[in-house]
Amino acid sequence: MKLQQALTTALAGLMVTIPAISHAQKPAANAKPLVLTALDYIEIEQLVAKYSRALDTCSNNGYDYADLYTPDGVFAPEINGKPGPRFEGRERLAEASGGGKLGCKNVPWIQQGVRHLYPNHVITPTPTGAVGVVDMLMIGLGGDPNKIEYDGYYDDVYVKTPQGWRFKSRTHHAVLSEGLRVK
């Protein structure tokens, strides 16, 4: 009898505990956004600045770029609303910047001396971190340091990790004239 009571009590405890754990793992739909500090905003802005620098130089064979993402992070480009190749995980992200198995060779924007600029950055807190939207400009196209092109915008999801703020996902919405593409 005591064994049956102990099992019944344990089962009842599990029935209460498991849903509570499951509920605690994901924020409720009406969960309040995190309160970001001024330092959080600065660190997220620095993440975007580091992104530009890593992309423009293919530093550390593209792994400096890849390490700006979470281990399961995703970069997803779109051109005029059409999805492009999806880059997920460290190796694929290094390739997105021209590195990894590509070895930073024949990277068009690097060969032209292009620099990426990210103005109009808006950061919004969420229950799990923050989201952001930022425009993208490219300067130096075709080797002309005075040529600037608007190349759409990014939608970002940021999360704070033990290593600092990282991209959980980054979607580039390229808006290009038909048939024109930076080469």
Specify the residue positions occupied by each region the protein language model found.
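Bacterial N-terminal signal peptides
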Residues: 9-18
